[in-house]
Amino acid sequence: HLRNHFGSKPFKCDKCSYSCVNKSMLNSHLKSHSNVYQFRCSDCAYATKYCHSLKL
C-alpha cells in the first residue's frame, strides 16, 4: 500500500516504458503486447484480450 504514497513502481514491462505498483497490474498490461484474444462474444465474431470489454 505504501508504494502508492511514495510513487514507487518496481514492476516494469520489458517491452515498453510502463511500470506499476503490483504484479497483477503488470500481468494485465502485458496482454496489450500479446496477439491472443481469448475472450469471445457468444453472439458474433468479436474477440478481445480483456474480459471487461465484453460486459454491458
Swiss-Prot record:
Similarity comment text for this entry: Belongs to the hunchback C2H2-type zinc-finger protein family.
Stored InterPro entries: Znf_C2H2_sf, Znf_C2H2_type
SMART domains: ZnF_C2H2
SUPFAM superfamilies, per the entry: beta-beta-alpha zinc fingers
Zn finger (C2H2-type) start-end: 1-5, 11-33, 39-56
Keyword Transferase belongs to the record: no
Source organism: Euscelis plebejus (Leafhopper)
Cellular localization per UniProt: Nucleus
Protein's UniProt name: Protein hunchback
Signal peptide stretch: none
GO molecular function, one term: zinc ion binding
Matching Gene3D superfamilies: Classic Zinc Finger
Repeat found in the keyword field: yes
